[in-house]
Amino acid sequence: MNDGRFHHWKAHFMIHILNKKEIRSHTSLRGWAALMVVFVHFRSFFHSSIDPDEFTFFLYKGYLWVDFFFILSGFVMAYVYDIEHPKRHSMRDTMHYLIARIARIYPLHLISLVATLLFFIMVAFINWGLGEEACCVFDDSLRNAESLVANLLLIHAWGMFDWVTWNFPSWSLSAELFCYLIFAALLTIDGDNRKLALVALSCTAVLFYCLCIATSSDVDENFRLSAIRAASAFTIGILLFLGRSAISTLSERSLTCIQIAACIALFLSLHFGVADILSIGLMALIVLVTWEDRGYLCTCLDTRYIHAIGLFSFSIYMWHYLIKFIAKQDWESFTGLPVQSSAVGSMLFVAGMIGLVIPIAVWSYRHLEIPTRKWINLRLTGLLEAKYPPNWQLIMVPSERKR
């Protein structure tokens, strides 16, 4: 595609982007969920005298906030790409969707994976320079050549490993990609067949949660089922969108009461460590009752800084674990003391870690996440348009903040 034709196409592309109003409450809720995951992983730094797991299950059950991400994702994808429209999408439009999704998650995943690999290479060289065994690059079953290739292909949570590998949080991106491919398949089939596919997905979700209940296991207990776990929560999000009219007639006061009751119930269910399916159901209810950006909870969520945390949530999520690992290694190398050596010291360390994660995430969002997303979107879409020149048709790709 020559430059003139490319810029002509780009102008049309921007004009015909499907405009969807951002669900600001959902953006803010993503930020809350990301911070909860950070606290879940940082709680291991606390001194035993202030171990939160001694008096509450709230952080122990924090893995459920990842399921919350999947529910939000399913709802937003159904909303942005108009899943209830019976007409099937063309393969070309579906490819545009996949390009947008890959551009959304893969660049930061690749950058953080490379950073993780470089860190372990650096540690190996330092150990070698000190006359110690050069370890830590391909050190165990969590970090080997096979898992590295799987991470590069973003398929490492598709049932081939027993646990997380390399940059641990990236497992959810792999599971998310699995959901994106399922959603792409839904877009390419028409209304009746799409309904049948959704019924099949719903049955799969029911079977997964019934298996968890029957075996008295947590949803994260069998890592090889991570893709099914993600698809189950993602399907809940789609179904919530299809049933969203259930709250449209509620007054703002009624909606506020439901929002407050759902939040209190969710807090209590996490605190007492009840069955995961109940907490997931309450999370789903919160997603549903906030999608219209009405009610007191939405007013609280729609503040500048809380919304900003939502925008930075992906970078927060992707960098916090590597920062945690590096900081722990450096602290213990320089001081010779474990992080948990004192209650006050451990609290200050956790506060410092959170204070470090946020600015790094802001920088990452502005200088890595957004630029690479735009670059890949333009380049891959340009290649697609060069191969399949359009007689203009609507391309359903959300604007930057809605993705």
Predicted segments with their positions:
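Active-site helix-to-loop segments that bind/position phosphate- or nucleotide-bearing substrates
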Residues: 102
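Membrane-interface helix-loop-helix regions
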Residues: 95, 105-173, 209-213, 281-291, ...
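Short, conserved phosphate/pyrophosphate- and ester-handling motifs at nucleotide-, phospho-/glycolipid
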Residues: 30, 67, 176, 309, ...
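His/acidic/aromatic-lined binding-pocket segments of jelly-roll/cupin-type domains
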Residues: 67-69, 232
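Hydrophobic alpha-helical transmembrane segments of multipass membrane transporters and ion channels
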Residues: 107-111, 115, 178, 315-319
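Acidic/polar hotspots within intrinsically disordered regions
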Residues: 2-3
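Alpha-helical transmembrane segments in multi-pass integral membrane proteins
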Residues: 9-25, 35, 39-62, 77-94, ...
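Conserved beta-strand->loop/alpha-helix structural units within folded catalytic cores of enzymes
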Residues: 28-34, 73, 105-110, 174-188, ...
